[in-house]
Design a protein with these regions (language model features):
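Short alpha-helix capping/helix-loop boundary micro-motifs
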Residues: 275-287
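Short, Lys/Arg- and Gly-enriched loop/turn segments at beta-strand edges
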Residues: 299-311
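N-terminal Lys/Arg-rich, disordered targeting/topogenic segments
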Residues: 1-13
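Bacterial N-terminal signal peptides
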Residues: 24-33
Length: 422
């Protein structure tokens, strides 16, 4: 939407707001006359005629008008906020309460092209932010373009999501969709927790156990590549039909309905609704002796009560309203320098801000993580995290890719964050 469109829209909203105030004011003034006017009462008595009682649900009418005015006020406030925040930017409506902003900033005299999507959750009530896998069948070994992912999820906007293994498409880090944990954390990297209408960020750990009565062992991760031969890993059907190869001295057990249904040192078929546990043989010996009353318990820490979705990234960019780039703590020093970037954050009022930065070209040189962190803070984020970037950086809005990735339309990616209809 250009500046004229915004001006027209805002003046129309202001006029509508004023008209609604006049109507409400008129109702308030008329109510005493309608229900308590003595002249009207005398007239009714003299006429000696039955008067039909018309029930006017004034409270409901008043409340509806107040709701309408409140929504108009919120929309006006959101529009004004975006205009103030991004002077000189190209601003377009994606839908009510959702804006696409396009601008260029200069760092050390060099241009950086930035695309932003802002969502006011109190207005855009028919949409939600959620992670989406590239596969329609929840297969973790999959990659698709962001356009395909967005169309498959009926989404009006999307950005690329968490890191992934380029050869296979398996997400690297915490991924929960609709309360189901698909992959566990790597190096306890920071993640975004998505609740109903609000967001939180935290470093996330896996809290998982393989249980047998009072005996249990720690499960180090779920559906992730092995990092140490001593680790105990759990795999579900989202990983694929079979578990990966066991490490040296390793063993596998397949669990379904709290029972061991198969065991071997070779890769096992993963049962539907069950697990294959891959671990050192000595760790699994006590379970092999029993084979029954065995359970798998997988949670995250923080447990985040009522969380719907989780997606990890890293490092932090903004934490508690302060620039906070913990690149070394999250073992991400390899992604320094000026590069294409993707980030997500939220304001104190839970307005969501998704950002992509083009890079590696003369027209847009990219950002360092510190530059990105300062930008996220400048647009009002109280908390923000970095997502996968570089060649993965891409933003989709209303049917098209709006940034300029190195590969036209963006490379095939493992997962995305989408703004989808509820």
């Amino acid at each position: 939407m250009d500046t004229l469109d915004l001006y027209t829209e805002n003046n129309y909203s202001t006029a509508k707001f004023s008209n609604q105030l006049l109507i409400v004011g008129g109702l308030v003034l008329l109510l005493p006359f309608i229900f308590n006017n003595p002249i009207m009462a005398d007239d009714i008595t003299v006429a000696h005629a039955p008067v039909p009682v018309i029930k006017v649900e004034s409270n409901k009418i008043y409340q509806q008008m107040m709701d309408d005015i409140s929504d108009e006020s919120k929309i006006q406030k959101f529009n004004d906020s975006v205009k103030r925040k991004y002077p000189g930017a190209l601003i377009k409506d994606i839908d009510t309460g959702i804006k696409h902003i396009k601008l260029t900033k200069y760092y050390d005299g060099k241009p950086v092209r930035i695309n932003i999507v802002e969502i006011d959750n109190s207005i855009a009530k028919k949409y939600e932010l959620r992670p989406a896998l590239s596969s329609n069948t929840d297969n973790l070994h999959s990659k698709r373009t962001i356009t395909t992912i967005a169309k498959n999820t009926n989404s009006i906007a999307a950005v690329n999501g968490t890191f992934f293994k380029p050869q296979t498409g398996v997400p690297l880090g915490t991924l929960m969709i609709d309360n189901k944990i698909y992959t566990g954390p790597i190096y306890n990297r920071v993640a975004l927790g998505i609740f109903d209408g609000k967001y939180e960020t935290a470093r996330v750990e896996l809290n998982a156990k393989l249980n047998m009565g009072n005996y249990s062992i720690k499960i180090d991760n779920i559906n992730q590549p092995r990092m140490l031969s001593s680790y105990t890993l759990a795999y579900t059907r989202e990983w694929g039909a079979k578990a990966p190869v066991s490490p040296k001295y390793g063993y596998q057990i397949a669990i379904k309905d709290n029972k061991i249904v198969n065991s071997s040192s070779n890769p096992l078929d993963i049962p539907e609704g069950g697990y294959v546990i891959v671990a050192p043989y000595r760790a699994l010996q006590p379970f092999l002796a029993s084979k029954n009353n065995i359970s798998v318990d997988i949670k995250t820490n923080p447990e985040w009560k009522d969380v719907k979705h989780i997606i990890s990234g890293g490092p932090y960019l903004v934490k508690d309203s302060n620039v906070y780039v913990d690149i070394n703590a999250q073992k991400l020093s390899a992604i320094g320098g000026k590069n294409p970037r993707t980030a997500i954050g939220y304001t104190k009022n839970n307005t969501l801000i998704m950002v992509v930065v083009d890079g590696r070209e003369n027209q847009s040189v990219g950002m360092t993580l510190v530059q990105l962190a300062n930008f996220m803070k400048s647009v009002g984020c109280t908390n923000a995290i970095n997502l996968d970037g570089g060649g993965s950086t891409v933003m989709y809005v209303n049917g098209q890719v709006v940034n300029n990735p190195a590969f036209k339309g963006g490379i095939a990616i493992s997962n995305a964050l989408v703004i989808a209809r509820k």
